[in-house]
């Protein structure tokens, strides 16, 4: 029985799934919008939201050791300091007054080859 099982397996073993989600999250932060299957978009969305929340906390904290710890926590997903800098200093400040809901999933139809449902996962623009 699958009671209380949160994660979708996406027909992959654990390390493959972890790599897939980290790569999708990286793509979202680099280009701010990706086209992928709906199932993958729904699977990566919580990871992206959690990372943005950590980046917001890193910006708002006064303790330098806490800021370093949060930056390292974000870095463990990507292992790319430039990307962490972009997330913490460019993306997170956009959502300073927003409590969650930093992304949206727009369904765009079906893939021609295998009829998989495709979606756009994008970061929301800054509120005016």
Curated annotation (Swiss-Prot):
Q: Which InterPro entries match?
A: Ribosomal_bL17, Ribosomal_bL17_CS, Ribosomal_bL17_sf
Q: Which PANTHER family match?
A: LARGE RIBOSOMAL SUBUNIT PROTEIN BL17M, RIBOSOMAL PROTEIN L17
Q: Which family does it belong to?
A: Belongs to the bacterial ribosomal protein bL17 family.
Protein name as it appears in the record: Large ribosomal subunit protein bL17
Task: Give the record's subunit note.
Answer: Part of the 50S ribosomal subunit. Contacts protein L32.
Tell me which UniProt keywords the record has, alphabetically.
Ribonucleoprotein, Ribosomal protein
NCBIfam families annotated for this entry? L17 (TIGR00059)
One annotated GO molecular function is: structural constituent of ribosome
Q: Which GO terms describe its biological process?
A: translation
One GO cellular component term, please give it. Answer: cytosolic large ribosomal subunit
Pfam families recorded? Ribosomal_L17
- Sorted alphabetically, which SUPFAM superfamilies does this protein's record hold? Prokaryotic ribosomal protein L17
């Amino acid at each position: 029985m699958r009671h209380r099982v949160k994660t979708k397996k996406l027909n992959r073993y654990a390390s493959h799934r972890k790599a897939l989600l980290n790569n999708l999250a990286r793509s979202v932060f680099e280009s701010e919008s990706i086209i992928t299957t709906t199932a993958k978009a729904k699977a990566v969305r919580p990871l992206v939201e959690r990372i943005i929340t950590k980046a917001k906390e890193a910006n708002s904290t006064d303790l330098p050791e806490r800021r370093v710890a949060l930056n390292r926590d974000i870095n463990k997903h990507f292992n790319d300091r430039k990307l962490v800098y972009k997330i913490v200093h460019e993306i997170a400040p956009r959502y300073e007054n927003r409590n969650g809901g930093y992304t949206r999933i727009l369904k765009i139809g079906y893939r021609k080859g295998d009829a998989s449902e495709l979606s756009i996962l994008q970061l929301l623009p800054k509120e005016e």
